[in-house]
Amino acid sequence: MDFKFDHVHFVCRDVDAMVDFFERIFDAKRISYNPDFNGAASAVILLGSMRIFVRGIRADETPDAVAPDRVQGLDHFGIGVDDVEEAAKWLKARGAVFSVEPVRRGMGGRMISYIRAPENIDIEIVGPYIGHK
């Protein structure tokens, strides 16, 4: 199984300020922006070859009682694979617990799934990019 780092995803109060910071400080490039991605503004920026997803807080999101800061900050990190369903089988065989089974609902119609790591950390398993690269 060939795993590779895919992206970092921030959830924040001010998407534009977060994107502006990366553009200004690191000379990152905004490669997409959606003012309403499932209820919140969302942007993808490119820093070198690394993608950073930045999303606003959705109206129905509230902090978790165990992790009150979970709604903001680092949401998850993504690991790219060629085939999400095959990777899911491989990971399940090793004891991975899935919080989201493979489904095609990621940005740009990508196949995604999520596994839960210790300390309530989410790891997204994502298929190849369909839209932006």
Regions found by a protein language model. Name each.
Residues 2, 9-52:
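Core segments of cupin and vicinal oxygen chelate
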Residues 6, 40-41, 75, 111:
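Residue-level marker for the onset of beta-strands and adjacent loop->beta junctions
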Residues 21, 85-90:
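Short amphipathic alpha-helices within nucleic acid-binding modules
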Residues 55, 67-75:
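Helix-adjacent hinge/juxtasegments
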Residues 1, 79, 88-133:
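Vicinal oxygen chelate
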Residues 70, 77-85:
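Mid-chain, well-packed structural core segment of small domains
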Residues 31, 60-65, 100-101, 133:
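A short, acidic/glycine-rich surface segment
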Residues 1-19, 74-79, 129-133:
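N-terminal beta-strand motif that seeds the catalytic metal site of vicinal oxygen chelate
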